[in-house]
């Protein structure tokens, strides 16, 4: 009987100490912060399967552009590029927006101030240094179009 009790005690001890939760919780990084675009990829595929994908690497001037996501669901997009008769790096557009971000589904909706258009995107990657946003154009059901932006975090 003592052997049976020892075996039971040993198995119980093994059951309590032998199991370990191997799943590490997914780390959640904030969308809030200031982001610098580094490149974009434009993809287009027709219903016949013909298509292309172009990668556009931004210039140093274009990398000075900023997408700012504030905690109160507002933001600002500032685009910079070479402009003028003697091209200098200048702000070519600046737009305020509001946004709704669902981190569990990774959906992001951006509405620019003064418009009724809502741009819908998917957060493909979001970590402490990098974010990829994919915008899909569904206006033509026979052609798939998407633009994926890659950003580098400037600040949080």
What is the role of each PLM region?
Residues 15-18:
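C-terminal motif of bacterial Sec signal peptides marking the signal peptidase cleavage site
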Residues 6-10:
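Sec-dependent N-terminal signal peptides
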Residues 20-96, 100-156:
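Lipid interaction determinants
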Residues 1-4:
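Positively charged n-region of N-terminal signal peptides that target proteins for export
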């Amino acid at each position: 009987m003592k052997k049976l009790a020892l075996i039971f005690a040993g198995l119980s001890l093994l059951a309590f100490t032998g199991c370990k939760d191997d799943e590490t919780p997914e780390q959640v990084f904030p969308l809030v912060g200031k982001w610098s675009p580094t490149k974009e990829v434009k993809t287009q595929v027709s219903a016949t399967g013909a298509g292309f994908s172009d990668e556009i690497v931004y210039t140093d001037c274009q990398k000075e552009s900023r997408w700012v996501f504030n905690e109160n669901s507002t933001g600002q997009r500032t685009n910079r590029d070479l402009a003028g008769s003697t091209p200098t790096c200048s702000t070519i557009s600046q737009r305020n927006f509001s946004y709704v971000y669902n981190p569990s589904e990774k959906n992001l909706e951006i509405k620019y101030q003064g418009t009724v258009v809502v741009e819908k995107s998917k957060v493909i990657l979001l970590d402490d240094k990098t974010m990829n946003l994919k915008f899909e154009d569904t206006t033509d059901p026979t052609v798939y179009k998407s633009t994926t932006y890659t950003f580098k975090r400037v600040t949080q």
